[in-house]
C-alpha cells in the first residue's frame, strides 16, 4: 500500500492510501507500485490516476512534480482539479 498526498498552493486535494499510482511523466506513462525504487520526476500536464481496489480517482495536474520514497508519494502541483468531473 502507498501513502499519497496531492497538494497545491490552495491546499491538500488528496491524502490517503492507494494500491498504485499512474502519471504521465516526460518519458511517458509511469506506474508507481509498492516498494518502487525512490524517484523524483516532473509530471506532464495531464491525468494522475489513483487506484485502490476497484476504485479509480483521477486528478488533472498542471506544473507538477512527484516524489516517491519508502512507499510515501507526494505530488506537488501548481494547479490541480478533480479529473472525474472533466
Annotate each PLM feature:
Residues 2-86:
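Compact, glycine-rich, soluble single-domain proteins
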